[in-house]
């Protein structure tokens, strides 16, 4: 049917396109893109105009009909609101043509730019002593390249417009008919399929752990977040700042302070609670790094802190840089473990969500299959992990993170430096011997740090029996804020790792967790598990019958139940 319709309409297409060709003027300025682009939060941002910019030069153009500027230089205007201008002058000696950018609010050669909003550069004669003077202004890309002196070139033929409408309508008929037919068929199929599905079958259908569609839904909307998804993952490009009222200081780090704040809604009584991370002027680079990480729409994940916007603010204390994110009342993981003893179910949820967040960070694609830039955190620790209301983790504080761009050279990676918190640094980071030829080595350092955080969780789980007060990894073996040299002694010289008491292994699930974290803090980076493998291990913990057939690692726990914690 579609082919027959196209064959029948083909002669009409030829006639209509012939009519269009006969109505086109000798020269039509090239079409341009719009000079605005949509911002992430729905506003519009004015882009600087592209104009011919050759100042004053000799010209062979006369003031009859139209001509080209013959200017070979295209410039980006300095200010977004500037327009393109052309000035044609003739005196007793020569003819000159001038093409520039100019602010339409200001006069040029003593004349106002009356036609600054015009899409074409239509010359208008101005009175000047001793010379013939024409000037035009226009607001389209390179519109001052085509100079028009005659009014007959400034408007399109009514016949041309009519013919274009006719040929467009005829051209769209076949695909429009096919599209409508496909929609009707798909709708009928869905209705028929839903009628066949029994409600009882739907309710008894077992829910999968997490399939492809579940992961895609997480990217579209995170219902478990403490902030409405309509605000999420936007950059505030508008000059008007968000109506935010700072409340209380809830955290302070090396680079910034974190405040609980109120984001006011349409009425003064309504607000949403948000977190505002404020960087001083001196820490611009940390703010920019974190802003650039958050700006990647593919970063969005249920176990990554939900981002709202980034702003630059001027205060009485000077210039500040803000990151505005979701607020999580339970605080960071270190604070939560200090205050609470957790159950086995809590440990499984916290550990699983932590591994999923890191796996997403490290991945080169989203759960939906879209390409994504892999990112390494480089400062993973319990104080940089937040606890959500449903007792799952989300990663935060990306000020030291690194995007593993394939265009980065070995020198670029080497210049990224020895960063992180000494207590959580992997052995190869402590002694600066990372394999810069392989970007996977950066991910392996995150996995080591993750193992220490998993140990912290396990040490506060009541499933292991006696639960001691919270201690960070390596506890009293090092001072409260150890330096790199003291951690070298413990981790490199002594090959020390946090202690795993034998009674922890009496619980089957804890035994698997201990085996997993031991493989993750292996001294050899290449022997460590990946974050994705750890996430799969935790998923298997929901199904004890699967534990004997793990695919990530075939290594079994020794029969005596002991684990080597000093690899």
Swiss-Prot record:
In which tissues or organs does this protein occur?
Widely expressed in adult. Expressed primarily in mesenchyme and epidermis of the midgestational fetus.
The terms under GO molecular function for this entry are: ATP binding; glycosaminoglycan binding; kinase activator activity; metal ion binding; SMAD binding; transforming growth factor beta binding; transforming growth factor beta receptor activity; transforming growth factor beta receptor activity, type II
Active-site residue list = 379 (proton acceptor)
**Positions of post-translational Phosphoserine modification:** 409, 548, 553
User: Which residues lie toward the Extracellular compartment?
Assistant: 24-166
How does the protein associate with the membrane?
A: Single-pass type I membrane protein
Identify the InterPro entries for this entry.
Answer: Kinase-like_dom_sf, Prot_kinase_dom, Protein_kinase_ATP_BS, Ser-Thr/Tyr_kinase_cat_dom, Ser/Thr_kinase_AS, Snake_toxin-like_sf, TGFB_receptor, Transform_growth_fac-b_typ-2
A GO biological-process term: lens development in camera-type eye
The cysteines joined by S-S bonds are 51-84, 54-71, 61-67, 77-101, 121-136, 138-143
Q: What is its EC number?
A: 2.7.11.30
Regarding how it is modified after translation, the entry says: Phosphorylated on a Ser/Thr residue in the cytoplasmic domain.
Chain ranges on the Cytoplasmic side, renumbered to this chain: 188-567
Record-linked PROSITE patterns:
PROTEIN_KINASE_ATP, PROTEIN_KINASE_DOM, PROTEIN_KINASE_ST
Q: Where are the transmembrane segments?
A: 167-187
Secretion signal span: 1-23
Looking at the record's lineage, which domain of life comes first? Eukaryota
Sorted UniProt keywords? Apoptosis, ATP-binding, Cell membrane, Differentiation, Disulfide bond, Glycoprotein, Growth regulation, Kinase, Magnesium, Manganese, Membrane, Metal-binding, Nucleotide-binding, Phosphoprotein, Receptor, Serine/threonine-protein kinase, Signal, Transferase, Transmembrane, Transmembrane helix
The ranges of region (Disordered) come to 545-567
- Protein location: Cell membrane; Membrane raft
Q: Name one GO cellular component term.
A: nuclear body
| Role summary | Transmembrane serine/threonine kinase forming with the TGF-beta type I serine/threonine kinase receptor, TGFBR1, the non-promiscuous receptor for the TGF-beta cytokines TGFB1, TGFB2 and TGFB3. Transduces the TGFB1, TGFB2 and TGFB3 signal from the cell surface to the cytoplasm and is thus regulating a plethora of physiological and pathological processes including cell cycle arrest in epithelial and hematopoietic cells, control of mesenchymal cell proliferation and differentiation, wound healing, extracellular matrix production, immunosuppression and carcinogenesis.
Give the family, as the similarity comment puts it: Belongs to the protein kinase superfamily. TKL Ser/Thr protein kinase family. TGFB receptor subfamily.
What interactions and quaternary structure are annotated? Homodimer. Heterohexamer; TGFB1, TGFB2 and TGFB3 homodimeric ligands assemble a functional receptor composed of two TGFBR1 and TGFBR2 heterodimers to form a ligand-receptor heterohexamer. The respective affinity of TGFRB1 and TGFRB2 for the ligands may modulate the kinetics of assembly of the receptor and may explain the different biological activities of TGFB1, TGFB2 and TGFB3. Component of a complex composed of TSC22D1 (via N-terminus), TGFBR1 and TGFBR2; the interaction between TSC22D1 and TGFBR1 is inhibited by SMAD7 and promoted by TGFB1. Interacts with DAXX. Interacts with DYNLT4.
Q: What is this protein called?
A: TGF-beta receptor type-2
Native species of this protein? Answer: Mus musculus (Mouse)
